């Protein structure tokens, strides 16, 4: 399997619960390296641009409102099969359907406040990483 990079966001609900370290431990325990990381409080404009793919969906406004409701942790994860590995760690979008032991099953409250975001494909990951991290701010290790 190839070494990949994927974007991960710890959303405002999980940041407010003070579980950033527990989530980072899961990434690292699964063999993923954190090669870039920063905390940010997204502006409405940034959240709307980042989630533009969902602009026509009925949940778009609520998603943007949620993502700007508090700070988020944004990180780039690197490792073999990083995209799928991160998605497996996150669990199903709806925490009620997420497998026990996944990030969403353990830390999320609802399908809206679902603790984490992760890129769904290599193409998406490249676009999402570039959105938050200029290349010079991502470091292989």
UniProtKB/Swiss-Prot annotation:
InterPro entries: NDK-like_dom, NDK-like_dom_sf, Nucleoside_diP_kinase. Its EC number is 2.7.4.6. Its main location: cytoplasm. It catalyses: a 2'-deoxyribonucleoside 5'-diphosphate + ATP = a 2'-deoxyribonucleoside 5'-triphosphate + ADP; a ribonucleoside 5'-diphosphate + ATP = a ribonucleoside 5'-triphosphate + ADP. The keyword Protein biosynthesis does not apply. The active site is at 117 (pros-phosphohistidine intermediate). GO terms for cellular component: cytoplasm. It is found in: Cytoplasm. One of its GO terms (biological process) is CTP biosynthetic process. Belongs to the NDK family. This is Nucleoside diphosphate kinase. It comes from Burkholderia ambifaria (strain MC40-6).
